[in-house]
């Protein structure tokens, strides 16, 4: 029975962390190792984590060098066959997510599994703001924004051991760099589940204003260049029409039902 290590990196996440924790603990798949890496929160995040401490395999709180450093700490401490990263603004759509993913790993014998996600407003978690369709990955459509949604990505730990962890000198695009490194350069095998597995609140680390937009494009360009992909500032803009389409697609998906 495959063990899945779910890692949550958090910092001052008192408003959202409980949804994240419960979405993991309520999974029907039971061979889950849950790891929480906190960046020395000063709000009530640690008190909330403590409520569920007996069901969490590992929970540490210490200063770190950012979210990607926290992710790396979690991966290093994990003992699972499969790694999943679920940030403290996000939560699984339902209790069957991990079970479905493990089933896909077993059936397809692949290195990774990913799916779609939806964005919701922090004050209205049932209302879809944008639908992100990951699509079947193809290096040719990379610059058009057709990449696996990182929060939905499950990867065998052996892949990280072979090809490395997240680059901590990136501020908000180390996830994009990781996807390029694994899917384009190393050509790992994958299976795409055409359904929503993760719900993400708007306003996360990588979605805070115009400065973040500029930084993300700059780091995305750097990630392409470091991995031998030809790209420029203009090619980085090709993904935005697809993002706009995601705004329209939300209407066809309706509202979400929550189980709490």
What is the predicted function of each stretch?
Residues 195, 208-234:
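Catalytic core of nucleotide-sugar-dependent glycosyltransferases
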Residues 225-260:
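Membrane-proximal basic amphipathic "stem/tether" segments
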Residues 199, 216, 240-241:
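Short secondary-structure capping/turn micro-motifs that flank functional sites
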Residues 47, 51, 103, 222, ...:
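Charged/polar, solvent-exposed surface patches and flexible loops
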Residues 1-212, 252:
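Nucleotide-sugar donor-binding/catalytic module of glycosyltransferases
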């Amino acid at each position: 029975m495959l063990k899945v290590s779910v890692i949550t990196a958090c910092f001052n996440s008192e408003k959202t962390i409980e949804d994240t924790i419960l979405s993991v603990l309520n999974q029907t798949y039971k061979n889950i190792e849950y790891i929480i890496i906190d960046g020395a929160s000063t709000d009530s995040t640690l008190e909330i984590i403590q409520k569920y401490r007996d069901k969490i395999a590992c929970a540490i709180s210490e200063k770190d060098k950012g979210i990607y450093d926290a992710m790396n700490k979690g991966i290093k401490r994990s003992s699972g066959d499969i790694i999943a990263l679920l940030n403290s603004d996000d939560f699984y759509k339902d209790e069957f997510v991990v079970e479905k993913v493990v089933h896909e790993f077993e059936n397809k014998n692949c290195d990774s599994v990913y799916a779609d996600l939806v964005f919701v407003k922090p004050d209205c978690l049932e209302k879809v703001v944008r639908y992100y369709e990951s699509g079947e990955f193809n290096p040719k459509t990379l610059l058009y924004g057709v990449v696996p949604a990182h929060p939905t990505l499950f990867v065998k730990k052996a892949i990280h051991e072979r090809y490395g962890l997240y680059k901590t000198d990136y501020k908000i695009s180390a996830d994009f760099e990781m996807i390029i490194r694994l899917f384009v350069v190393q050509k790992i095998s994958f299976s795409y589940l055409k359904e929503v597995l993760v719900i993400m609140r708007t306003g996360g680390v990588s979605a805070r204003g115009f400065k973040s937009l500029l930084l993300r494009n700059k780091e995305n360009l750097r990630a392409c260049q470091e991995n031998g992909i030809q790209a420029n500032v203009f090619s980085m803009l090709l993904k935005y029409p697809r993002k706009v389409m995601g705004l329209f697609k939300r209407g066809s998906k309706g509202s979400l039902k929550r189980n709490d």
